[in-house]
């Protein structure tokens, strides 16, 4: 056997095994296929409690396990669908006026038979209050305003959802632009460090110290007021918070092993920043974007309310609320729809952002 072992040393491992077995069992000829590895997955014990699961799959499951986040997501989907299709669900346009049908109360076909939303409203008089139905008084039996009409005979339903569409476009566009600018600025500042970081952070402090209202006012003096001007104004101020988050994440990751390995292999700075580090901080970035959208909605509404927003006949939720504010004491039902829509929109984005923060943060996994 010793001689055979020495003789087998020059052969390949597989041939050596076959030769050794043949020498032990000369009466039987073994084929190579008899030495093939047979797989039987049924006999392999797998611990399902600790089975491998991707980060994003786990984050999605945790997000949908939070009821408030799911509720916020449903509200966002419903409002977005109504903002897209709502203005076309009746025959009115957002800019159309009919002074003969001004200040009509809400009236919905079918529901009016129940005695609610039938076009009647209570009016205060010197002797008390009485119920008035403008549809009946003016012979408009075939006219329906689901949310009522305003002082100029414009459909509140159509203008509310048109305003929601404009507000969403402004908020989402501003948030995405803020993400791109702030994320790039913060990653570059944190990666290079030293004097580069010091100069960039001083510029950041100066930009953050300029009041937003001053920037918007100056822009309105130079540019035409409108959607692009508001987006540009929000872009110039809201990216600061995003850059600080990106810089903080970069400072935590730039000395990690995977970054050092890429540097050792000769990868360039921008490859490391945007190919290696960026995918690992996308969770906090997405969360910050979701939090910045309701902030942009509120800022746009505030600017429109003080007369620095969307010019008529266009409308956003803020400018629409500003227009209806003058009729609040006489026709309070007019201002309720845009206020409710804007409140639900801001609440739903905050709920989704809070759910994403918990789902994408590994530190909160056990909470």
Where is each model-derived feature located?
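Gly/Trp-centered helix-boundary motif
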Residues: 1-179, 183, 324-348, 352, ...
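Alpha-helical transmembrane segments of integral membrane proteins
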Residues: 149-367
């Amino acid at each position: 056997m010793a001689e055979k072992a020495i003789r087998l040393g020059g052969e390949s491992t597989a041939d050596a095994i076959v030769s050794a077995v043949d020498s032990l069992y000369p009466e039987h000829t073994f084929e190579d296929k008899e030495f093939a590895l047979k797989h039987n997955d049924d006999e392999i014990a797998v611990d399902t409690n600790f089975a491998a699961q991707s980060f994003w799959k786990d984050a999605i499951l945790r997000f949908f396990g939070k009821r408030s986040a799911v509720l916020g997501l449903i509200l966002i989907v419903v409002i977005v669908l109504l903002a897209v299709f709502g203005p076309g669900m009746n025959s009115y346009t957002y800019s159309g006026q009919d002074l003969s049908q001004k200040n009509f109360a809400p009236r919905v076909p079918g529901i009016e038979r129940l005695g609610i939303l039938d076009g009647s409203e209570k009016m205060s008089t010197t002797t008390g209050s009485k119920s008035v139905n403008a549809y009946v008084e003016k012979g408009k039996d075939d006219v329906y305003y689901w949310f009522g009409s305003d002082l100029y005979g414009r459909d509140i339903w159509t203008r509310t959802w048109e305003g929601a569409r404009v507000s969403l476009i402004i908020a989402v566009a501003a948030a995405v632009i803020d993400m791109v600018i702030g994320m790039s600025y913060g990653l570059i500042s944190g990666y290079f460090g030293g004097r580069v970081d010091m100069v960039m952070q001083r510029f950041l402090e100066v930009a953050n110290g300029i009041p937003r209202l001053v920037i918007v006012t100056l822009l309105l003096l130079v540019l035409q007021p409108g959607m692009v001007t508001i987006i540009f104004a929000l872009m110039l101020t809201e990216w600061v918070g995003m850059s600080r988050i990106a810089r903080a994440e970069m400072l935590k990751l730039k000395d990690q092993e995977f970054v050092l390995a890429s540097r050792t292999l000769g990868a360039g700075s921008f490859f490391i920043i945007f190919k290696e580090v960026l995918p690992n901080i996308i969770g906090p970035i997405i969360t910050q974007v979701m939090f910045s959208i309701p902030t942009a909605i509120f800022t746009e509404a505030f600017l429109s309310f003080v007369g620095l927003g969307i010019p008529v006949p266009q409308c956003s939720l803020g400018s629409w609320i500003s227009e209806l504010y003058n009729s609040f004491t006489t026709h309070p039902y007019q201002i309720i729809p845009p206020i409710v829509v804007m409140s639900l929109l801001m609440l739903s984005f905050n709920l989704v952002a809070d759910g994403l923060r918990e789902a994408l943060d590994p530190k909160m996994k056990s909470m």
